[in-house]
Design a protein with these regions (language model features):
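Internal alpha-helical scaffold of NAD(P)-dependent oxidoreductase catalytic cores
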Residues: 1-9, 13-101, 127-133, 140
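A short glycine/serine-rich beta->alpha loop
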Residues: 108-112
């Protein structure tokens, strides 16, 4: 499409609050040839990058959050085995601003589900495999999640 201006923007909306997330966007990530127009339309900070970088960043963000969910589920399992109160351990752990409490809450369903986390972590693992890169931490995250979601 040499005569067209195309822009790519990965969405980081949460399914449960997509409209609110969209209305309260503080930063847009854009890539492609048609990015300048978006600066005139949206009055938010806009970061312009290569589309491939943005695609990989989207997968990385969601994979990291899936990993965080799995980590806290494993901490829950350890607390249960040691007869230690998980909510206290999670609270004291997430007090560290670098960690934060997002994705640390254990639900009855356990692990991560929904549409984006499973799709994106699997896409990142498969992309790495096709390029002869081993993402063993993420592969184990997928396997662990599969095991706890089955039970």
């Amino acid at each position: 499409f040499p005569d067209k201006q195309l822009a790519f923007s990965p969405e980081f909306l949460r399914a449960a609050s997509a409209l609110e997330d969209l209305q309260n966007t503080k930063l847009m990530l854009l890539g492609g040839t048609g990015c300048k127009t978006w600066r005139e339309v949206f009055h938010v900070d806009i970061e312009i990058a290569e589309p491939r970088e943005l695609i990989l960043a989207k997968y990385a963000r969601n994979s990291f959050l899936a990993l965080k969910v799995a980590f806290f589920n494993q901490m829950y399992d350890l607390c249960d085995a040691l007869d230690v109160e998980y909510s206290a351990v999670a609270h004291y752990t997430t007090m560290d601003e670098r960690i934060g409490d997002s994705h640390s809450f254990i639900t009855e369903e356990r692990g991560f589900g929904g549409h984006c986390f499973p799709k994106d972590i699997n896409a990142l693992v498969k992309t790495a495999q096709r390029n002869n890169v081993e993402l063993s931490i993420l592969k184990e995250t997928v396997e662990y999640n599969r095991r706890i979601r089955k039970s």
